[in-house]
């Protein structure tokens, strides 16, 4: 599940 972007530090997996 994408919970944001990696750059924001939320660990977004897309």
Curated annotation (Swiss-Prot):
| Chief location category | secreted
Q: What does this protein do?
A: Cleaved by the protease thrombin to yield monomers which, together with fibrinogen beta (FGB) and fibrinogen gamma (FGG), polymerize to form an insoluble fibrin matrix. Fibrin has a major function in hemostasis as one of the primary components of blood clots.
How is the subunit organization of this protein annotated in UniProt? Heterohexamer; disulfide linked. Contains 2 sets of 3 non-identical chains (alpha, beta and gamma). The 2 heterotrimers are in head to head conformation with the N-termini in a small central domain.
For this UniProt record, give its keywords in alphabetical order, as a comma-separated list: Blood coagulation, Coiled coil, Disulfide bond, Hemostasis, Secreted
Any one cellular component term from GO for this entry?
extracellular region
Please report the PTM annotation for this entry: Conversion of fibrinogen to fibrin is triggered by thrombin, which cleaves fibrinopeptides A and B from alpha and beta chains, and thus exposes the N-terminal polymerization sites responsible for the formation of the soft clot. The soft clot is converted into the hard clot by factor XIIIA which catalyzes the epsilon-(gamma-glutamyl)lysine cross-linking between gamma chains (stronger) and between alpha chains (weaker) of different monomers.
Its recorded name reads Fibrinogen alpha chain
Localization, per the record, is: Secreted
Q: Which GO terms describe its biological process?
A: blood coagulation
Q: Could you give the domain comment from the record?
A: A long coiled coil structure formed by 3 polypeptide chains connects the central nodule to the C-terminal domains (distal nodules). The long C-terminal ends of the alpha chains fold back, contributing a fourth strand to the coiled coil structure.
């Amino acid at each position: 599940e994408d919970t944001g972007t990696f750059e924001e530090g939320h660990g977004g997996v897309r």
